[in-house]
Amino acid sequence: VMEALSLFEREKVRGIIMDLRNNPGGLYDQAQKVADAFIESGVLVSMVGAGGSQQKAEHATRNGDTKVPLAVLVNQYSASASEIVAGAVKNLDRGIVIGETTFGKGSVQMLFDIKAPTPGRGTGPVAGNDDERLGLKLTTAQYLTPGDLSIQGVGVTPDIEMIPLRVQKRDTETTISLQ
């Protein structure tokens, strides 16, 4: 992202369109870094655990590496980390969000290693394979976009709603032969 922003600055780009449509997400810390590159100040995202106890808040630290106008494209398949970026851009008034309401995945999961006993062998990895590992993924928190807004189950609502046209592929050979 930083390399692209440096190039945009050298080329005197007048605006940026960030396309997060069909982006299922990614790593929490990477979403925070992308948002930080565009936003001057404020809480970019925060995490809360059970009972609403705040676990972590990520603040803008880079003073917004770029100041050019920003539009973020989203759709119903934009989820998780992409919603962190879109929510920060929208709720901190850094740019406009265009498209459909996003997926609404505001939950944070952690993967815990499990060592299960092997039947008849005491303790150790399952099936006696020392390389085999098991894990348990648990939801441990949810993240909130700026303004302490939960997107879990509701998504990020765009500033400008645009319903995509569903274009069907036409068989031009058949169409021509029918004429």
Task: For the regions a language model picked out, list residue spans one by one.
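Cleft-lining beta-strand/loop regions that shape enzyme active-site pockets
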Residues: 1-121, 142
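Acidic surface patches and DE-rich sequence motifs
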Residues: 49-51, 128-131, 145
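Short, surface-exposed patches at the edges or C-terminal ends of soluble domains, predominantly
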Residues: 62-64, 111-114, 126-129, 147, ...
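Intrinsically disordered, low-complexity segments enriched in small/polar residues
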Residues: 109-131, 162-179
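Conserved catalytic cores of soluble enzyme domains
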Residues: 125, 138-139
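Conserved functional hotspot residues or short segments at active or partner-binding sites
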Residues: 135, 142-179
